[in-house]
Design a protein with these regions (language model features):
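Conserved active-site and SAM-binding loop architecture
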Residues: 1-151
């Protein structure tokens, strides 16, 4: 006997034949991606926005563990500092670090490069306050289904 739930009656079934591109706003460690993975939904980690660097490091470790690319290899230490400042990274999830804080001895060059590499590996737009609609690069909507989540 088939079982039916009230959700079957309340919500229409959604199906797509197009590949799913996931955009996670306030991504944290990627719970939405984990849910899709656990449900067996094939998807692409397309973009995310998370400014808290510990969460970004966790996201990368969970979802992009095989990406050990050094995206900062061709950059000077100064270039990395400027990039992180411009992106508006945070370590407390409440306010962005200032250039002086990023530059300080509290954060080593290795830490700054790891942050930058994690951002690039996770396709992270970082600070949602500085994003615009075009930054989401939602194109080819006839070819892809874009799923945007926030938490």
């Amino acid at each position: 006997m088939d079982q039916i739930s009230m959700f079957d009656l309340m919500y229409p079934t959604f199906k797509t034949n197009n590949p799913v591109r996931l955009i996670e706003l306030f991504a944290g460690v990627g719970s939405q991606a984990m849910a899709l993975r656990n449900l067996g939904v094939p998807f692409e980690h397309y973009l995310m926005s998370e400014w808290e660097m510990h969460a970004t490091a966790s996201y990368k470790a969970i979802h992009m563990a095989d990406d050990d690319t050094d995206y900062s290899a061709e950059m000077s230490s100064e270039d990395v500092i400027q990039a992180l400042t411009q992106l508006g990274i945070s370590v407390d999830g409440k306010k962005p670090l200032t250039e002086e804080q990023i530059r300080s001895h509290s954060y080593s060059d290795a830490w700054r490069r790891e942050c930058y590499n994690n951002i690039k590996a996770t396709h992270n737009l970082v600070n949602i306050c500085s994003m615009r609609g075009g930054d989401l690069a939602i194109t080819n909507t006839d070819r892809y289904t874009y799923l945007m989540t926030y938490s």
